[in-house]
């Protein structure tokens, strides 16, 4: 759909996308969605923007779940993106499904620095670029309060953004009417803000 509209679509793998060893995996889980991954994404974006066929002023980012978290992290800690779509992001590991949060980050009392460093709620006021934030209201994996708390901080900072909630949809927003609507909404957003 995006290619048909003339967009270039690129996917970057950051250093914690795949772990080479159990030791590395254990180290990486303690810094999920942290500054090192963002440095990797920014390096990739700098390369992309240096290509003659790319308009460096019209670069966007999007992701779902963990990718949605990277989108928010990138948009609140860099000025590289004109717009971003974040679907079902983890904004604070305290709000994430305990089973997965403690698997990835350990318990909050065992990794307080990790939880603090990976909370995007506190950096919402630094948002650069236009954001479309999307969440299913029945998401039992990444609870909607992740988005609500992020939105509350955007409102406090008087930052304009777009938001779409899908009632009675879970994490995957997987039924055809909702998924088709979501992709059309995202395309409409790109056309307006990129």
Q: Which sequence ranges carry the predicted segments?
A:
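Cap/lid segment of the alpha/beta-hydrolase catalytic domain
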Residues: 1-64, 91-102
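Active-site loop/turn elements of alpha/beta-hydrolase fold enzymes
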Residues: 14, 89, 166-168
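Short glycine-enriched nucleophile-adjacent loop
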Residues: 68-79
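Mobile cap/lid helix-loop segments that gate and shape the active-site cleft of serine hydrolases
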Residues: 83, 89-129, 156
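Short beta-strand/loop motif that positions the catalytic acidic residue
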Residues: 127, 133-135, 139
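Conserved alpha/beta-hydrolase "acid-adjacent" motif
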Residues: 140-149
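C-terminal catalytic histidine-bearing segment of alpha/beta-hydrolase fold enzymes
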Residues: 148-149, 155-194
């Amino acid at each position: 759909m995006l290619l048909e509209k003339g967009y270039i679509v690129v996917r970057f793998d950051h250093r914690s996308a795949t772990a080479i060893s159990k030791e590395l995996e254990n180290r990486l889980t303690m810094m999920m969605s942290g500054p090192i991954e963002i440095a990797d994404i920014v390096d990739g974006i700098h390369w992309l923007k240096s290509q003659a066929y790319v308009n460096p002023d019209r670069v966007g980012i999007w992701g779902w779940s963990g990718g949605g978290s990277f989108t928010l992290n990138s948009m609140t800690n860099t000025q590289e993106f004109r717009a971003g779509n974040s679907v079902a992001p983890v904004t604070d590991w305290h709000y994430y499904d305990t089973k997965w949060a403690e698997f990835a980050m350990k318990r909050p009392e065992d990794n307080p620095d990790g939880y603090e460093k990976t909370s995007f709620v506190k950096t919402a006021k630094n948002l650069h670029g236009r954001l479309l934030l999307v969440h299913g209201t029945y998401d039992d994996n990444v609870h909607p309060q992740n988005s609500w708390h992020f939105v509350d901080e955007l409102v406090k900072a008087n930052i304009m953004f777009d938001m779409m909630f899908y009632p009675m949809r879970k994490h995957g927003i997987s039924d055809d009417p909702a998924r088709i609507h979501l992709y059309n909404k995202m395309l409409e957003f790109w056309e307006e803000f990129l």
